[in-house]
Amino acid sequence: MVLLFASCGQRYEAKQLVKAFVKEHATEEIDISSFSDLDSTKVISDSLLQVMRQQALKDTLFKDVKLGAIPQSTTLLYIRMRYGEDSLMQSRTFYFDKDLTGIIAFK
């Protein structure tokens, strides 16, 4: 039961980080329709993180992007944000360190 509350709290915290990021960096108004569950992965390499970070700087949906440092841990957390109209639904996946101190990459 405690684990369930911890994961709900982490999901809420991740959603708040993404909402704040969108509010601060979006180049247009983004209508967020939903978020996935918060999950973890160990398959994202440092080189893939670097590529995602470089691509994030070129993403025209966001401006003046500032990302957190790449963590030493091999475990990352991620959440998918869905936005847009039903016929044009799009998504971005945001990656965090395991302590949710900030967004470290997105795609």
Model-derived segments and their meaning:
Residues 1-8:
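Sec-dependent bacterial lipoprotein signal peptides
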Residues 8-107:
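Cystatin/cathelin-like cysteine-protease inhibitor module
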